[in-house]
Amino acid sequence: MSYKVNSSYPDSIPPTEQPYMASQYKQDLQSNIAMATNSEQQRQQQQQQQQQQQQWINQPTAENSDLKEKMNCKNTLNEYIFDFLTKSSLKNTAAAFAQDAHLDRDKGQNPIDGPKSKENNGNQNTFSKVVDTPQGFLYEWWQIFWDIFNTSSSRGGSEFAQQYYQLVLQEQRQEQIYRSLAVHAARLQHDAERRGEYSNEDIDPMHLAAMMLGNPMAPAVQMRNVNMNPIPIPMVGNPIVNNFSIPPYNNANPTTGATAVAPTAPPSGDFTNVGPTQNRSQNVTGWPVYNYPMQPTTENPVGNPCNNNTTNNTTNNKSPVNQPKSLKTMHSTDKPNNVPTSKSTRSRSATSKAKGKVKAGLVAKRRRKNNTATVSAGSTNAGSPNITTPGSATSEPAMVGSRVNKTPRSDIATNFRNQAIIFGEEDIYSNSKSSPSLDGASPSALASKQPTKVRKNTKKASTSAFPVESTNKLGGNSVVTGKKRSPPNTRMSRRKSTPSVILNADATKDENNMLRTFSNTIAPNIHSAPPTKTANSLPFPGINLGSFNKPAVSSPLSSVTESCFDPESGKIAGKNGPKRAVNSKVSASSPLSIATPRSGDAQKQRSSKVPGNVVIKPPHGFSTTNLNITLKNSKIITSQNNTVSQELPNGGNILEAQVGNDSRSSKGNRNTLSTPEEKKPSSNNQGYDFDALKNSSSLLFPNQAYASNNRTPNENSNVADETSASTNSGDNDNTLIQPSSNVGTTLGPQQTSTNENQNVHSQNLKFGNIGMVEDQGPDYDLNLLDTNENDFNFINWEG
């Protein structure tokens, strides 16, 4: 921009008197410079845009023959149709089709003749890309397409097409499974990255999925195939992702469905989520093999006795409890249907029952069953007898009481307490008198004068005694039960859940051949203590033929059942129920049977009966057994080589049990059943003679023997000859006493006490610690003169 100079101002400098004009000129100059600069920038930008547009317009596009061919699919199809018509010798049809389809051909040639490659190579650009086949490519393609289409649409097809189609389907399934597992692996990898546990491992998704499923698989290797891309495949645009059934990849419970995959070897050591939880908290699908049908465990809340020999020690397996309704009685056929059973809680006494059963006659005898149960000793526990049922090859351990299983208000405590009352203290809680045959010499008659201490002993004894189930004369089963205040009469219960020794007799035998027995069924305590040593008060040293040094099992109480034994049939029949007990604070008792004459007037029987034998047989399976027997009104025959009789004084009065001090107690104030002191052998070489021995393996004492013979009131000494139970007849009484083990017997001190009444002279014998040969236990025969149940103050087996 040019400015004109004023003629009046040659230097083009305005005068001073016009200051405003100078500043305005300066501003106009700056604005003009700025406008000129902006206009040039805009002009340059416009030129650049024009150049870019020109370059975009003038930019040549790359020609691609394949792209053109794909874009012109219809033209390609027309060319293949023309090729098919030409090779099918349809020249006129091909020329007409080429003319109508506007195909590029040599116009100088006749369309009927078709294109000629030799003359028109330069002009046939369109047909240069057609695949040359003998019959035309379109025909061959159509054959393959139609065959596969029929196969896929279940319309048939050739065999090769079907095989090809199956291969294609299998490949598609594998690819689909692989894609699904890859997606799952990507998800796991993403979760691991979020937790900070991923360190850029390159793992095959198939191996990872198999490892997560718990299936064994070869170690993962580096993937080398391009198609096996470890990168998660995006599922967008793939419509057939979820169209195939895929096996589950994380199924913790294999029992939920049929398609569940059971884990075989989880990669980690934790089987809590993948393995079945069958034995995690209980004995689950079956009863333990340790339990027997009639033997509840110590967890039994009903109060039934438990078997302490069959304790289940499994860590995670608790033994189930057999409810009373599921318990099956040992002999369900012993109870006849036509014999009524008394439902009264008070039953008759033993003597009244005996009289009533005698009146029943032979008709009641024919109704008896011949089922018996044998009591043998357990091999593992010396105090646990086994019960063997006839016809069975196996034996079950008998019920063993435990002090741990104390349930004062349960049925077992009631039964124990009732046993103590009936067996030992039958006159304490009763307002009625005992039978006349038992009043004369019953130890409990005098013991009832001290009800306080006896009751204390009874409570301690009540937790380990068991009811005895015996078959009466009519063949019915009866279980001893009772309350705390029950009379001396026994209670007859129909409960069959408690296994016990069942005794019966042959109904065809005469009553005169039936022998009275006392069957002792005991329940030793687990908490056993070694046997205490007692001083030998006899004039000769105690005989010890071998001690196995096993602890004795102590039991406070043993229940006695009066029974009948038939010597010809060898069977035992329970009679009159349980009788009475002796001292309740004694060592462990074992099953014992002592043959005595029939009940009744004891003094009358002594004058009319001939001597009988008491056969003490050692039980099977015990290693040591101590037998304590207190006899009354007997004589001791001492000798070195010959048996010399030495009579004890006999007052001739009725036998009376007297309360004295127990020599086994350190206090000396406990009441115990004992008898006055008797005479002892006068020589150190003198001993007690076992007069009759059953077999060759019996105990033989050289120069020492014991024979206990009673005197009749007319001072006639009758010594019983050696007889057996099977050959006894008439009024001779012979029975077997079957304790429970391999017995060893040592003559021990006499436990006697003196009192102001010297009418009864008793002797306390203790046989203990005699070594026996296995399975050959001896039989100990004590010749007793007319011995009945009143002649035994104390019968006890320790072992």
Curated annotation (Swiss-Prot):
InterPro entries: LisH. Residues 37-68, 101-127, 255-406, 431-501, 568-622, 644-691, 705-758 are annotated as: Disordered. Its main location: nucleus. GO terms for cellular component: nucleus. Transmembrane segments: none annotated. Residues 354-370, 482-497 have a biased composition (Basic residues). Belongs to the FLO8 family. PANTHER family: LISH DOMAIN-CONTAINING PROTEIN, TRANSCRIPTION ACTIVATOR MSS11. Required for diploid filamentous growth, haploid invasive growth and flocculation. Putative transcriptional activator of FLO1. This is Transcriptional activator FLO8. It comes from Saccharomyces cerevisiae (strain Lalvin EC1118 / Prise de mousse) (Baker's yeast).
